[in-house]
Swiss-Prot record:
Its cofactor is Mn(2+). It comes from Bacillus subtilis (strain 168). The gene is rapA. Belongs to the Rap family. SUPFAM superfamilies: TPR-like. The keyword Ubl conjugation does not apply. It is an enzyme of class 3 (hydrolase). Involved in the regulation of sporulation. Acts as a phosphatase that specifically dephosphorylates the sporulation initiation phosphotransferase Spo0F and inhibits its activity. Can also use Mg(2+) and Ca(2+), with lower efficiency. PROSITE patterns: TPR (PS50005), TPR_REGION (PS50293). Keywords: Cytoplasm, Hydrolase, Manganese, Protein phosphatase, Repeat, Sporulation, TPR repeat. The N-terminal half of RapA contains the necessary structural determinants for substrate binding and enzymatic activity, and the C-terminal half contains the binding site for PhrA peptide. The central TPR3 to TPR5 repeats provide the binding specificity toward the Phr peptide inhibitor. This is Response regulator aspartate phosphatase A.
Amino acid sequence: MRMKQTIPSSYVGLKINEWYTHIRQFHVAEAERVKLEVEREIEDMEEDQDLLLYYSLMEFRHRVMLDYIKPFGEDTSQLEFSELLEDIEGNQYKLTGLLEYYFNFFRGMYEFKQKMFVSAMMYYKRAEKNLALVSDDIEKAEFAFKMAEIFYNLKQTYVSMSYAVQALETYQMYETYTVRRIQCEFVIAGNYDDMQYPERALPHLELALDLAKKEGNPRLISSALYNLGNCYEKMGELQKAAEYFGKSVSICKSEKFDNLPHSIYSLTQVLYKQKNDAEAQKKYREGLEIARQYSDELFVELFQFLHALYGKNIDTESVSHTFQFLEEHMLYPYIEELAHDAAQFYIENGQPEKALSFYEKMVHAQKQIQRGDCLYEI
């Protein structure tokens, strides 16, 4: 009887690299196929603890991809994330070089998904220490894109723009990375909005929407529509903004995307600013319920803020509670935005002394944003 031949770990390593290529391209079916092949081959592989750690890290990255692609509530992703993290962190002392890079980079993605931006940046910065070990251009572009994304959310606008352009230049050379190209266009447009140049953001978003439609990707189409709504709001065209937000909400609802609370929140915010109180109240109730269903603590707070500020009777206690929550989580970009909206509200209602306190809060948040590098030193 012939003994079963042992598979070299180097061969399985190449297969994991192929798996990672499909993950980065968001090719779910191919990624799932190669994942199964890897799992079968590992059973007959020569002993290699580093390779097994690499497999565990890639399984975690696979879950991050699925969490982005799959509609909310279709799986037990949070439980699986916890189990994978526990397994990987139990072997963290063994991680060196490229494995250490992947651990910190993938963990940063996970923290970002949880809206733990400061924690995400900490892991990205740790990954950066081993970036010199990365030789693949696409992997370098992946890192640049993730840095652009996190710096955008922390309102480090010019740094974010630099990373986004760097990533986009690489992705444009590869036809199979259209999803990332679209996402780079989103970040570039968002940075133009933050620079108060929404008219420069518009062509990037129109291109992104066109590419998303050609890809037939509902998530990216809904994101492009949402970002166009945000852009028109910045331009003061509230009716157009409401229309685009509404289209985004429709897709998010039908696909059960996890960014549905965000889309409804922005639509509700615009409706309140249009003085369309009846429709705004309806969307507020709907959005709050959905945010609770999705266990989205941030947007539960933000919906309650809208109701507290724009409802029939101003609830100053709830307004204060929201700012306290945002400060505890160091979400200064949200503080800046909400403080500005509250100040504008009080100015319009002839209460300049109350507006002043919110302008002061806005300026304080801007200072914290400008000092952002200090938040994630390691």
